Structures are given as structure tokens and as C-alpha cells.
């Protein structure tokens, strides 16, 4: 597994459809609607929190990928087989990914949690026994985001 450094900034994103995991694995990208995007996509890694659509893997983080960059595109450019989708013309971030990596130890949620994105660090991800262990204090999250944007905290 590619080494995760303690200070790496990791975006945890909710993945609701097994098709999206296959796209990440085979095509090397993940989509995020601009209207719901997190504060920054300038992160080192993206980890995927799997919902109930993933059966036995539900409510856990099992996969992550190094983020190589991102670009702005229309949904119809990403999913060409859905030209008539209601959001076909809406802007999305296409996050380019390195190879999908499976965690040696999944990070479960002891109970159902509702969130879209959260930021954590490499240190917290490696040490986590449960999703709540990923939480970074708000002041530390602010410092990490400012660092990624090239601003002093």
C-alpha cells in the first residue's frame, strides 16, 4: 500500500452506489456535484464511506485513493449513458484518482451516520477503530484546510 503520512489531509466522501466504486477502480475518477462540494478538494487522499447499498460492506470505510487533481465538467460528460438525466447539464468536479487501495482493517461505523464529507488526517485514519475516531477538532481542521490552500493559519 502506498504510504499514508500522519499529516496527509484526507477527504472522507460518502459513496452511495456500487457503480461509483467500480468507476473509481477501473476509470480512476470520482464525481462530486459542485452544489454539494466540500470546502476544498486539494487533499492528499479520498476515502470512501460505503452506504447500505454495499451490503456486507455497508457503513464502513474500506477503500481510499490518492488524489491526483480535479477538473470541472458537466455530468453528461462523465456519464455519457445518461444524456437525459435531470442533472445532465449541472457542473461536477471530476476528481482524478490513483489506484484504489483497500484498507487492511476496515473502519466501521458502530451506528448509522449521516454526513456527506468530512476531513481527517493520515494519522487519524491509520489509528481509527471507528468512524468517530476520524474527527479532527474544528480548529485543527481549519489549520489543515488553510495549509492546503497555501494560506498561513
Predicted regions: what is each one?
Residues 2-153:
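Structured alpha/beta reader/binder surfaces that contact nucleic acids or chromatin modification marks
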Amino acid at each position: 500500500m502506498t504510504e499514508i503520512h500522519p499529516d496527509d489531509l484526507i477527504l472522507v466522501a460518502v459513496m452511495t452506489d456500487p457503480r461509483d466504486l467500480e468507476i473509481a477502480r477501473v476509470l480512476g475518477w470520482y464525481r462530486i456535484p459542485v452544489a454539494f462540494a466540500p470546502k476544498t478538494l486539494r487533499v492528499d487522499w479520498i476515502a470512501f464511506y460505503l452506504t447500505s447499498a454495499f451490503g456486507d460492506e455497508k457503513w464502513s470505510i474500506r477503500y481510499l485513493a490518492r488524489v491526483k487533481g480535479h477538473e470541472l465538467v458537466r455530468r453528461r460528460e462523465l456519464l455519457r449513458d445518461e444524456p437525459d438525466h435531470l442533472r445532465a447539464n449541472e457542473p461536477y468536479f471530476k476528481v482524478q484518482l490513483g489506484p484504489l487501495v483497500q484498507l487492511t482493517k476496515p473502519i466501521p461505523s458502530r451506528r448509522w451516520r449521516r454526513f456527506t464529507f468530512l476531513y481527517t488526517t493520515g494519522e487519524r485514519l491509520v489509528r481509527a477503530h471507528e468512524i468517530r475516531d476520524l474527527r479532527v477538532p474544528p480548529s485543527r481542521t481549519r489549520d489543515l484546510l488553510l495549509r492546503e490552500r497555501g494560506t498561513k493559519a
